[in-house]
Amino acid sequence: MIDSTRYPRLSRIQTPDDLRTFEEADLTAVADELRAYLIESVGKSGGHFAAGLGVIELTVALHYLYQTPVDQLVWDVGHQTYPHKILTGRRDQIHTVKQKDGVAPFPKREESVYDTFGVGHSSTSISAALGMAIAAQRNGDDRKVVAVIGDGAMTAGMVYEALNHAGGMDPEPNLLVILNDNRMSISEAVGGLTKMLGRASGSRTLNAIREGGKKILGDKKNNPTARFVRRWEEHWKGMFVPSTLFEEMGFHYTGPIDGHDLPSLVGALKTLKTLKGPQLLHVITTKGKGYELAEGDQIGYHAVGPFDPSKGLVAKAGAKKPTYTDVFSDWVCDMAAADPKMLVITPAMREGSGLVRFSKEYPQRYFDVAIAEQHAVTLAAGMATQGAKPVVAIYSTFLQRGYDQLVHDVAVQKLDVLFAIDRGGVVGPDGATHAGNLDLSFLRCVPHMVVMAPADEAECRQMLTTGLRYEGPAAVRYPRGTGPGTALDAALTTLPIGKAQLRHSGARIALLGFGATVDAAEAVGRELGLTVVNMRFVKPLDKAMLLELAKCHEAFVSIEDNVVAGGAGSGVSELLNAEGVLMPMLHLGLPDSFQHHASREDLLAEAGIDQAGIRAAVLKRWPQLMAKGQQALNAAAG
């Protein structure tokens, strides 16, 4: 429970209705308590941190002035929504964020009526809010709809599709877009738009003149004086402020204003509430505001584990196993030294994808395209047509956003593009929006693709080299976190395409493990005396080995950290069917549902693809193996 002596105002707020009982003069004190409580809470639980600190005042102002949940707030991405959750009935549970059965890390409609739209990926808020505004208008509802979007998310093309639609509608939608401009996404925001917005923060005088003129002249299009002023402004506006872009798209632009000045925020929002049609409010904020260490290291404090706020983040001592991301990070630098044709592309995920070192050592071969997955993939395709060897470093969940480009621009033309796909399979605490549960299914159906899934760190390095040297599109899909700890070979060696690895020779049943499931499968196979295969390739499958195993085994069990539907196991069944081989098969994988947020270990166990789950599934199907398993357990215990 919250300490009412430390938080005398916040302790009285369970919902925004409680917030609205305060006088406007008290809001700054409420914001100060909310910021302190967020620092204390995330220090205990971990979670997304700096983004929430940057929108404390904005969150308070919005819930104070708008009649939420009747008026609807749509938060882009959701990294910044912990303060929103605290003010909307989840204050005393916020310490459970990201934990199994705890508060969701992103807005989730099933969790609260105040979470009006589920998010996790960026740049969706304006489209969603516009849809809500249109539906409300058609229903005769006089509700306000507000989309809050960061400048990093504004780099995605979907944003401009929504702005273009909203600004050209008749009747005009009752929509407010708030641009939360902190010059950051997860990493530093990049690109021409970011530079343009950056100029705005130094143009307050000109903006004041513009806004004053609007009040005097009004915005009536037929006012001759106003038309003259607008023509004069056309000559100068591009030099100073970003209003041109938004106003030419049909939005009334206000700002920029200080997003940490509550009186200014409240005043601006009061005015905007009275206006009709699409509005855009530009606020300048600081990511990590109010916690000095986070302000100084906005990337490092974007998402944190539990820590002591009085000390800040402390590096863990001692050697640790490299993560798969670390393996990729080292490989990409080693390969760049060996192959001058290699170029690397990332859609705004330099830190997460392990490209910090590469970006510093090879800046002319590193391309951060901002949050633009579609562009990233087609950019790689264009590079490949000129003999370059592009690598697209991307999270599995974000590759979904560039799927048409993967098919249409890369695979159809059989171009040499390597997709280094991080966070494949079960991801964990970030929940369904960040899971990589679908990638093997949507990759293996694409003609010309080679799809690989490493069982360990050494194999990951080999597969990356194999994919880069393959003539055609290739994908290496690896999980979040660490592997089994296999020693790495500095050599840049390749694997034969489509060849599996026999891990253990047994009898009766063959366990076919793909990727991160191989270690657990091998442990079960050795215990029960079964054959175990590290399949390595999801496409092409090792046809020769599968047909040979089919001659001397009674059944196959496919095991993958991907949905069963259309996955690697389905490919095995299709191959056997095409060859006229009748073989009983048990497919183990992820369920036909979106998994909730929990630890990776919890989710693997729930899906039955950890060691205990594989063992239980095999024995349930073939109970006659129980005696063998019991003998092994007795031997281990004795």
From Swiss-Prot:
GO BP, one annotated term: isopentenyl diphosphate biosynthetic process, methylerythritol 4-phosphate pathway
Record: residues binding thiamine diphosphate: H79, G120, H121, S122, G152, A153, N182, Y291, E373
One function term, GO molecular function aspect: 1-deoxy-D-xylulose-5-phosphate synthase activity
Keywords linked to the UniProt accession: Isoprene biosynthesis, Magnesium, Metal-binding, Thiamine biosynthesis, Thiamine pyrophosphate, Transferase
Gene3D superfamilies: 3.40.50.920, 3.40.50.970
Cofactor note: Binds 1 Mg(2+) ion per subunit. Binds 1 thiamine pyrophosphate per subunit.
Catalytic activity: D-glyceraldehyde 3-phosphate + pyruvate + H(+) = 1-deoxy-D-xylulose 5-phosphate + CO2
GO cellular component terms given for this protein: cytosol
Family: Belongs to the transketolase family. DXPS subfamily.
Record text on subunit structure and interactions: Homodimer.
Function: Catalyzes the acyloin condensation reaction between C atoms 2 and 3 of pyruvate and glyceraldehyde 3-phosphate to yield 1-deoxy-D-xylulose-5-phosphate (DXP).
Protein name as catalogued: 1-deoxy-D-xylulose-5-phosphate synthase
Organism: Xanthomonas campestris pv. campestris (strain ATCC 33913 / DSM 3586 / NCPPB 528 / LMG 568 / P 25)
Gene: dxs
